[in-house]
């Protein structure tokens, strides 16, 4: 009897280990469409199509961040940290911008319209934003030297000068190439 019990113990411990659940994008789809993609497009959520998603670990903590893309006609995409059922937007982009990934950070660089450039960065630790920076610049595209009409820089939600902002961005280092495995959204 003892021999049988000893042989069964390894099998029992295997069956008690937590099984990782497959990721269910549908749990987040409506929130992504209505709170993030739809406002970015200024279209109705019925016209906005999410094409695919990928799970990537930006900060190397073993927890994946969610990267979602719209179809090519819309070209919206967003990167989110996941905390249970809640999402935190880390960066989003449209046809006039791009997502950039750094070691432990993600951001976007955008040409919103002729004469406006925006960029923002989120630095992560344990899948939470620990610091951030934003820049917005508007300039007169009709002037000969494209005179700057507005410049704004923030680091951790505080206005800073251009040098302080540039120091933050330089600490991010170079962008890294990410080739995520994309999964279709049904």
Task: Give a label for each model feature.
Residues 75-77, 87, 104-107, 117, ...:
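Hydrophobic residues embedded in beta-strands of well-ordered beta-sheets
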Residues 19-60, 69-71, 164-186:
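Terminal domain-start segments
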Residues 20-27, 109-186:
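Acidic, small-residue rich beta-repeat scaffolds with periodic aromatic anchors
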Residues 94-101:
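Repeated scaffold domains used in trafficking and secretory/extracellular systems
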Residues 76-91, 122-125:
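Beta-propeller blade repeat segments, especially FG-GAP/WD-type strand-to-loop junctions
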Residues 60-69, 104-110:
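Acidic/hydrophobic-patterned starts of short beta strands in beta-sheet-rich repeat architectures
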Residues 4-14:
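Sec-dependent N-terminal signal peptides
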Residues 63, 73-77, 92-93, 109-120:
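Short, surface-exposed coil-to-beta transition loops
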């Amino acid at each position: 009897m003892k021999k049988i019990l000893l042989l069964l113990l390894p099998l029992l411990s295997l069956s008690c280990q937590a099984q990782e659940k497959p990721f269910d994008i549908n749990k987040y789809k409506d929130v992504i469409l209505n709170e993030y993609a739809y406002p970015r497009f200024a279209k109705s959520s019925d016209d906005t199509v999410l094409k695919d998603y990928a799970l990537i670990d930006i900060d190397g903590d073993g927890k994946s961040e969610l990267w979602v893309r719209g179809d090519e006609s819309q070209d919206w995409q967003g990167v989110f940290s996941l905390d249970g059922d809640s999402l935190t937007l880390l960066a989003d982009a449209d046809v006039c911008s791009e997502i950039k990934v750094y070691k432990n950070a993600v951001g976007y660089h955008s040409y919103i319209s002729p004469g406006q450039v925006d960029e923002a960065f989120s630095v992560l630790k344990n899948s939470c934003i620990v610091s951030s920076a934003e820049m917005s610049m508007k300039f007169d595209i009709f002037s000969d030297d494209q005179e700057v009409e507005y410049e704004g820089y923030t680091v951790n939600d505080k206005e800073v000068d251009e040098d302080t902002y540039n120091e933050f961005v330089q600490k991010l280092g170079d962008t890294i190439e990410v080739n995520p495995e994309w999964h279709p959204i049904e």
